Amino acid sequence: MRLLPPTLTAFYATEKLLEHSHVCEELSVVLFVHPWDMHMWDGRLQKFWMPWLVGMPSETAQAICSVLMGNILVLFPKLRFCFAHGGGSYPIIRGRVSHGWNVRPDLCAQECQVAPNKLDGLLWTDSLVHDAAALELLISTVGKEHIVLGTDYPFPLGELEVGKVVEEYKPFSSKDRENLLWDNAVKMLGIDGNTLFDKNF
């Protein structure tokens, strides 16, 4: 059953989506957001695998901006969204989005009176960013406590060695690595970590 569009590029406070968000928050559901409508660019992404390389990160950034400026996280602060691919291109445009919200509130602050960058700490993402510099930027955006291991399995844009970027990120302590590789996901899902070691799980 499809409850949401493939990406949340139009996630505004409509009656239907408010009801849906309320139910998801009540049930402690985690909403994993993965892009797919990345072919609708008037043919400009036809070559060089660009729907996947450029279109997907852009779609994810649009979804995040819709959630932030659509007032969803203000109305439902316990609602957990986890965005694929390290939040797409959102971390690099985060400052631009916040600046736009400040200088054009007539366009950007119609639904939400809280600056987007004040809500970043409520976002979750996976770790699939492919290099250390991108991971560092992501950490500065959502916090290392809100990043879970991403694999993109079985698709070719996943890491060839799952978790390698996390494992090799030098600023991390061993506890940080443990958190990103599995413990953060346990906390995000709200489950007892001990059940993972239960053979009947």
What are these regions (language model features)?
Residues A13-L17, D42-L45, R94-S98, A134-I139:
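Distinct, well-ordered alpha-helical segments
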Residues N71, L79, S89, W124-T125, ...:
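Mid-to-C-terminal alpha-helical segments outside catalytic/metal-binding sites
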Residues N71-K118:
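Aromatic-lined glycan-binding groove of carbohydrate-active enzymes
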Residues M1-G70:
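Active-site gating/metal-coordination segments in enzymes
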Residues Q62, P105-E136:
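Aromatic-anchored helix/helix-loop segment that forms the rim or "lid"
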Residues M1, L27-V29, P77-R80, P116-L123, ...:
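Short, well-ordered coil/turn segments that N-cap beta-strands
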Residues L4-L8, W36-M38, G86-S89, L128-H130, ...:
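Active-site beta-loop-alpha junctions enriched in small/polar residues
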Residues L3, F32-H34, C82-A84, D126, ...:
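Active-site neighborhood of phospho(di)ester-bond hydrolases with catalytic His/Asp-centered motifs
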